[in-house]
Amino acid sequence: MNYRELFTGGLSAATVCACSLLVSGAVVASPMSHEVASEGGVMGGSFYVGAAYSPAFPSVTSFDMRESSKETSYVRGYDKSIATIDVSVPANFSKSGYTFAFSKNLITSFDGAVGYSLGGARVELEASYRRFATLADGQYAKSGAESLAAITRDANITETNYFVVKIDEITNTSVMLNGCYDVLHTDLPVSPYVCAGIGASFVDISKQVTTKLAYRGKVGISYQFTPEISLVAGGFYHGLFDESYKDIPAHNSVKFSGEAKASVKAHIADYGFNLGARFLFS
């Protein structure tokens, strides 16, 4: 088992635990929990806002691309040795069996949330943004050529049997409803937390936005810096329930006869860690 499998497996287990903890926290709501919240300075029944820097790593597998409504297509990548981009020349697409890969997002990956806390239980509405640029599978003579692919109806490419798709990135903007539980302590400012969420992701592939049902798990710790401010560090996993993306438009239809659109079947998820803060309003 590699580290990614261990990480995602742990978060899956945490998601199950979150559901149980939320139910027990909401139903029990014992006097002890209220006493803990009061003594620890985290008052129940308060609104909060949060923000986090969340470096993310893509988990994009089985990126199967083909012509829309066709069972079989062939995907060819641009020749690495060609120093110019000319998609009208079939011979420039010399790499058979080409598939796209995507890089990690360490810069433009952020989360923001607004929520309500009551004792150790919290519910929040969270928005996030992820951008994963296309990753070159080696050194290309022309920058950006790794974003181009020719989709053909036959194994051999000709002037009239292909169109060109350009995918230079995948972006995922999501809105999630999370249920969280904080394990509060009377004598420590540090509280472990676990969250489980469901919501919508808006996935942009080549300017075609597709809405998907999404899920998210989060685990971490919060440190009560002041009664109103908590510093947060943790990990997350974000996945989608469906793998189908249709009507990806052609970058250039060249001399292709027919509707130049592609479909993609891919498991698109991301995981990573977050560093941020929550601001409580009494």
UniProtKB/Swiss-Prot annotation:
UniProt keyword terms in alphabetical order: Signal
InterPro entries cross-referenced by the UniProt entry: Msp4_OMP-like, OMP/PagP_b-brl
PROSITE patterns the UniProt entry points to: PROKAR_LIPOPROTEIN
Entry annotated with the keyword Translocase: no
Domain of life: Bacteria
Oxidoreductase keyword on record: no
Signal peptide: 1-29
Family: Belongs to the surface antigen msp4 family.
Name of the protein in its database record: Major surface antigen 4
Gene this chain is encoded by: msp4
